[in-house]
Amino acid sequence: MLFRSKYGVTVNAILPGWIATDTQPEHERLQGMKTPLGRSGKPEEIASAVAYLASPEAGYITGQSIVVDGGNSIIEERGW
């Protein structure tokens, strides 16, 4: 996608963690409770990250993977 960058196109990714929904299975809810924040994320929190990346304020951010997981990736890296 770098060839599109000259047109102002940015390409990023959101990597969500456990997200609470009406259909979230119990085992996923329990996994969310094990994150450093002690809960699953909210759909609105993912939407906020997407909205930011789509905003003019993020115009110089490209090629990034933004982790929105309540710190879960940190504890997984350390094997906690």
Where are these regions (language model features)?
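Short C-terminal tail/terminal secondary-structure segment
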Residues: 62-80
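A glycine/serine/threonine-rich, flexible loop-to-helix segment
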Residues: 6, 13-35, 45, 75-80
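Short, small/polar-rich loop/turn modules that mediate ligand/substrate recognition or access, typified
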Residues: 5, 10, 61-63
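Conserved SDR Rossmann-fold cofactor-binding beta-strand/turn motif
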Residues: 10-20, 54, 67-69
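Short, small-residue-biased leader/transition segments that mark boundaries at the very start
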Residues: 1-2
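A conserved structural motif in NAD(P)-dependent oxidoreductases
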Residues: 35-46, 57
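Conserved functional loop/turn residues at catalytic and ligand-binding sites
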Residues: 8, 22, 39, 56-57
